Amino acid sequence: MGNSYSLFLRQSYLDAWEDYRRSLHRADFPVWDYIILTASNEAQANAYRQQIAIRRAKNLLPARTHYAVLPDPDGLRVGSGGATLNALRYVCTQEGTFAGKRILCIHSGGDSKRVPQYSACGKLFSPVPRELPNGRRSTLFDEFIIGMSGVPSRIRDGMLVLSGDVLLLFNPLQIDAPASGAAAISFKEDVETGKNHGVFQMDEQGNVGEFLHKQTVEMLTSRGAVNAQGKVDIDTGAVLFSADLLADLYTLVDTPAKFAAFVNDRARLSFYGDFLYPLASRSTLEQFYSEKPDGSFTEELHACRTAVWQVLRKYRMRLLRLAPASFIHFGTTHELRALMTDGVSAYSFLDWKKCVSGCCSSANYALNNAMVEEGCCIHDDCYLEDSHVMGSAIIGSGTVLSHVTVSGKNIPANVVLHSLKLTDGRFVTRIYGVADNPKEGTFLGGSMAAFGNVWDGGDHSLWQAKIYPVCDSMAKSVDAALNVYALAMGTGDYDAWVSAERVSLCSSFNSADMAAILEWEMHLRKAVKVERFLSVICCSGTIEEAKEIFQDAAISAYQRRLIEDKAAAADVFTRMRIFYCLGKVMGDSQEGEAYIKRAFDEIQRMVLAGAAAHGTGLCAHHQPVEEETAVRLPLRVNWGGGWSDTPPYCNEKGGTVLNAAILLGGEYPVEVHVRRLPKPMVVLESADMGARGEFTVISDLQECHNPYDPFVLHKAALIACGVIPREGGELTDITAKIGGLYVSTQMHGVPKGSGLGTSSILAGACVKALFQYFGVAHTEDDLYEHAMCVEQIMSTGGGWQDQVGGMTPGLKLITAPAGIQQKLNVRHIALSEDTKAELNARFTLIYTGQRRLARNLLRDVVGRYISNAPDSLYALEEIQRIAVMMAFELERGHVDDFAKLLNRHWELSKMIDAGSTNTCIDQIFLAIDDLIDGRMICGAGGGGFLQVLLKRGVTKKQLNDRLHDTFQDCGVDVWDCTLI
């Protein structure tokens, strides 16, 4: 198929989807007044009605259309012509006329003998290897509804008749329907294809001259139906009848007596053979009488053909040759397998693919709404639909599985294995060869002699052979089917088989429980979606990909249970992603937020576990060694790699950060005091906030998740250091051992939300002060671990760079390999005196006058990482390289090159979190752009401090004057800072 040809059909496909969407949502868009499906019997009709009801309930079908499913009357096989007349009677009963009515009639009442796995559900609702844009897997019915959505706008009234086993690809804009008569929609196909179908031969007026049904290549050539390219005008099964033709045709059955004469199993009229033939301009009545019927030559058929000829002969059938167009016939099982495995590549331009609604671990087989568990072996060219393969099962090459669970079995090659639940609750699994023709008497390519007489009547075909045992469970029925195969191969348990109640392909489909089939498909589809969801997570997929899986239906309670079971068995990194992505997919709901919280709870538990492995709670079992102690620490500025130190990224990937300790106004801004109290209580004070609290109940000290609690940091430090337990205990027992306790924190001259690491450094100062108070011997690593635990207990989610930056003087390059227990390597960067002087002269902090709560921002950034946002993953990796390069340039004294890296980092920071900047920050940088060489935020950004590197020769006073001129008295100002 040529590229331009494919592009045209693809665009037509996309246009059809847009027409379909308009038919659902626009009241002025022309739609079918009636969509009628024909069915072979009431059971099949009920199955069709259920399928339609499901789609209507989900608003997937045009609401203005009247839907009807009409089984052959009285359960008799009346042929497609009889079914058409039955449809006409239905519409006329409803409307009284055909004028002004647009009717779509899809003939879908066959037994599907050539593809028996679709006998029960009907080939019309058999799967197509395509996932629709709304996330649903497609069926032939869905393709008809979508593909024909544009046709009503092309016709005034009348009926479009389609064959339910042929998928047509064309552009409705090419349809030019006649006002009266009929029109046959035809595509060009190779003569080798045409010989197995109907072929039209055009007369001089552009009408159908002859209708040649399943003729040889020689016959088609001799009748002039083959063009120079070896192509024929194939009968696609799509025919338009005008309203006046329908009215005349209806006169044949407008009374009960007439209806009974034409719609019965003796006449068994064919729509294509008996209604189209008289419309061909060169046909004759004598030839018409001799045309091969769907059933048998009978007197009733002869009489009906005479009447049909008289009614239709005055009309002609225009031949509508559409191109580019394509005709896809869902014929035999062998053809179906070939189409689903190798054939899909020819239709990739239609988004057809081997794996639809499933997870394929290999490209050597195809599946549709199926699951294959680890340890199973699926050989080449298999096709699995609505099936579950587990327990190290082996599926032989070329085999087709349908509606079956196979556990631990070895299924032979080139067979079909199809299970049905029957209306009495029992099961039958039918096995036959992919190449078998059920209309014939062969089985698995050989005779059926091994089974003896397995027929009730004279039809000794596989279709009627009662060889399939009925069992109490699907698993037992699979075993029984494999025994049938073994018997055909000359082995097997004959006694078990002969003593069992058995059914045929025919009788089993007529006894099928259609509701159970639909329930099975839906149940499996839910499980498959879970597998796809988990696969997206495990394969570093994104939230958008995860949401696409559930776009057509909300996550059910059953699916949530499956996901939670998988999460329970997963490692912590997978588990947190599962919960986070599940919460995001569920949207802004209470349940969704609960799952997101569980994701961060997993991170918190992981960090606490890592800290515990390093030995947190060091103050436990210690007595105070001092009456009072005080700790003062500097702040830090982050230059490179910030965010890579944040759990869970650092635990999973490792982290690299470059930062420096600073003083503000020449002072150490962070201060913590701890002292003994005579009373049995804990007193906490946040001096800079003017808050003081007295605690005598331990549970009040264990509540650490409120970011607005002025004592949340104090409480978390007491828990992390082991002064009080995280849960349980009595405060009176603790104070009896260590006495009363006073802990006070204070930040000197630092605005809230500064971005200078105040919270984490304050946590580190609390830990350091408690260690000193209790006389705990410790290393710097102990301080870092405990401070990080404080962060996690508060649910801030912060990393380790702030503690290192504030507790250790100078410029540091800090690295940590991946691992739940973070082992920090701190390398002090030795700078020349000239470089230090230049940095202190050019490096400047600017306060924005704004603040941003880091807790919410951390959730966003961490969420983007664990949901595998591609730009976030890239930036988190790249900023670590920049941190190392910054250290390299500063060690060489290349401050200008450091400034360039600072700018590059700023762009990457915005990729990690777009909220790190805003209009005000952008305006500040714009106002001083000519004065600075480098720019960066402090901490998370979005407020607090900005850091800049002045151009050579520019003074801090010049910068301050520019800011004051631009922003007046709104709080934007240069702050005095010193690198130490």
Regions found by a protein language model. Give the residues of each.
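Short glycine/serine- and small hydrophobic-enriched flexible loop segments
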Residues: 89-92, 277, 719-723, 768-772, ...
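Glycine- and acidic-rich phosphate- and metal-coordinating loops
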Residues: 726-750
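Short pre-catalytic strand/loop immediately N-terminal to key active-site residues, enriched for Gly-Thr
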Residues: 750-754, 932-935
